Amino acid sequence: HYGRTHKREIMTEELKELLQECDTLKARLVALRPLPAEALKKIDEAFAVEYTYESNRIEGNTLTLQETELVVNEGVTIAGKSMREHLEAINHREAIDYIKDFAKNDIEISEGTIKEIHALVLHGINRENAGRYRTVPVMISGSQHIPPQPYLIEEQMEDFTRRYKEMEKEKVHPVLIAAYRHDTL
């Protein structure tokens, strides 16, 4: 597995083909540029709402996709839903916008920026832990994944950011970098 073995990269033919397909699709998208501003806005909105919905759903948020859209784009409150669920949707959307600003301005993702994103996601929900490493062990119900012990987190985050920089320097395919980041975080 790429992220945990660091220097060992397993590149199967199937993976090479999938990465080539990604490159082909990206080239087709680039060829369509510049996309009309209205089309870009619609794509951006649809992505942000669906990503917010799916991320929060995994964490137990009960807002539907349509309710998530109303909360983040229209500022509507949904009867019978908790303030926490509303804040989770709003904060996630804010975090997406924050990350997009990083990409536009070519700002390096660091431990500090990851903590800032974490603080945005937990804003108004969990002040004590927002933007900080956790200090207690946790379990994820229904998952076989065992999160690291609190005393290991800082070291693992340092390793994560170091490895991410190495992968960028080595010109590792962006899809593999994204997979590493998703799997590791």
Locate predicted features.
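FIC/Doc superfamily catalytic core
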Residues: H1-L185
